[in-house]
Curated annotation (Swiss-Prot):
Its EC number is 2.7.7.6. It comes from Synechococcus sp. (strain CC9902). GO terms for molecular function: DNA binding; DNA-directed RNA polymerase activity. This is DNA-directed RNA polymerase subunit omega. It catalyses: RNA(n) + a ribonucleoside 5'-triphosphate = RNA(n+1) + diphosphate. NCBIfam families: PRK00392.2-5. Promotes RNA polymerase assembly. Latches the N- and C-terminal regions of the beta' subunit thereby facilitating its interaction with the beta and alpha subunits. InterPro entries: DNA-dir_RNA_pol_omega, Pol_omega/Rpo6/RPB6. The lineage of its organism: Bacteria, Bacillati, Cyanobacteriota, Cyanophyceae, Synechococcales. The gene is rpoZ. The keyword Nucleotidyltransferase applies. In cyanobacteria the RNAP catalytic core is composed of 2 alpha, 1 beta, 1 beta', 1 gamma and 1 omega subunit. When a sigma factor is associated with the core the holoenzyme is formed, which can initiate transcription.
Length: 82
């Protein structure tokens, strides 16, 4: 699934897949507000990461990347470092 998410990120985001991932994150959380804050914080980190990377143009917005990453982490927690 990780390889699939990198394909999604590199080729652009399928809106229906992104919606399903977002709904899954919200549905499986105990606090919708905190989940929204996590997505926003991750998106902000990615935006600054992109900025530090010499402003490479990306077709995927930071919020979209954040949803894909957090969804993958939720679905496959054994792949997280540590």
């Amino acid at each position: 699934m990780i390889e699939c998410s990198w394909l999604v990120i590199s080729a652009g985001v399928d809106s229906s897949d992104l919606a399903k991932r977002g709904e899954s994150l919200i549905r499986q959380s105990s606090n919708r507000y905190l989940t929204t804050v996590r997505i926003a914080f991750r998106a902000k980190q990615r935006r600054f990461d992109d900025f530090d990377g010499l402003l490479e143009e990306s077709s995927v917005k930071p919020v979209q990347r954040a949803i894909v990453e957090l969804s993958d982490e939720q679905d496959q927690p054994d792949l997280l470092p540590g």
